[in-house]
């Protein structure tokens, strides 16, 4: 059976006004995988942590696998019924987004995927930012489409707990 890993990061900031803090679930690199029927195991784990929102860090799909679009769409539309969802593209989405849908059927399917997600209220951030309110806190979430060559630059990770 496929497994996913839950990692907790704590980021401290004097700008966070609520004593409880802010809690996000971050999904990345699922590549169309399913964890239990209808991604039930993943959804239940997310619900257990009661996040204030869901941040997608890309690669929910595989650029040459149309089934991955269906799996990701189903999961994200389900999550969007309970949480605000913000989606930044990974390299698989980016390549499909930048490809002419007239020349590539997967790029055309990807456009439909984005439409489905937007209809469900998911914020897809193409080099954009949006503001959100979580309790007493105002936050800005950004989605950057970084040229793939820049992904070779190393950025250190926050402390894991």
Report each predicted region and the residues it spans.
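N-terminal membrane-anchoring alpha-helices
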Residues: 1-19
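General small-molecule cofactor/ligand-binding pocket signal
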Residues: 12, 25, 123-128, 142
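Short strand-coil-strand connectors
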Residues: 14, 133-135
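Active-site-proximal beta-strand elements of phosphoester/diester hydrolases
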Residues: 21-31, 138-148
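Histidine-centered divalent metal-coordination motifs
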Residues: 31-33, 91-92, 154
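Short, glycine/acidic-enriched loop or turn micro-motifs at the edges of active sites
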Residues: 32, 62, 146, 160
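Core catalytic region of metal-dependent phosphoesterases/phosphodiesterases
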Residues: 38-133
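Residue-level detector of conserved catalytic or cofactor/ligand-binding positions
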Residues: 151-161
